[in-house]
Amino acid sequence: MLKKTFAALALGTALISAGQAMAAEYKIDKEGQHAFVDWKISHLGYSFIHGTFKDFDGNFTWDSAKPEASKISVDLKTASLWSNHAERDKHIASKDFLDVKKYPEAKFVSTSVKSTGDKTADVTGDLTMHGVTKPVTFKAVFNGEGKDPWGGERAGFNATTTLNLNDFGIKGPGATSQTLDLDISVEGVKQK
């Protein structure tokens, strides 16, 4: 009886360990320009200002058999914002908006991933920005995974969300500019 119990326990442990081993760790490839954190905000209700954050880092775990077990963490330097207009960038970075001297970083850490289709999911997590942490849900799309030409393995995703700036204590420049659209595109390199 003891042998059967031990064998069952060993098999169970092996199966659990195998399941945990399937999730792989990926480092977001920002060095090769294969990852972007882009934003868009209304300009007076007439057009949109587009920009990006140039300095960020992050990682994620991914198992295509268990997408719900995935996790992601992204840190970005708020002073790295760029909108192709130096004076506007200075103004956005100032105390009037992001106050990057007081709040130099923003961070997103996922708390849950819920599949919504074959290649789509809702990724919910805590976004800390401007000294405020709020739950945010991104609509994510799995783009694909596989080997790269350099002998590594990669996986790629896009994710979008809309933020209400007032929720983070940031006053937009007017009633038409209280929401910010975020569009994140990442390609991760599997870590060995």
Curated annotation (Swiss-Prot):
Domain of life: Bacteria
InterPro entries reported in the protein's UniProt record: Lipid/polyisoprenoid-bd_YceI, TTHA0802/YceI-like_sf, UPF0312/YceI
Organism lineage string: Bacteria, Pseudomonadati, Pseudomonadota, Gammaproteobacteria, Pseudomonadales
Annotated SUPFAM superfamilies: YceI-like
Family: Belongs to the UPF0312 family. Type 1 subfamily.
Annotated protein name in UniProt: UPF0312 protein PSEEN5043
Entry keywords, A to Z: Periplasm, Signal
GO cellular component assignments: periplasmic space
Signal peptide: 1-23
Gene3D superfamilies: Lipid/polyisoprenoid-binding, YceI-like
UniProt organism field: Pseudomonas entomophila (strain L48)
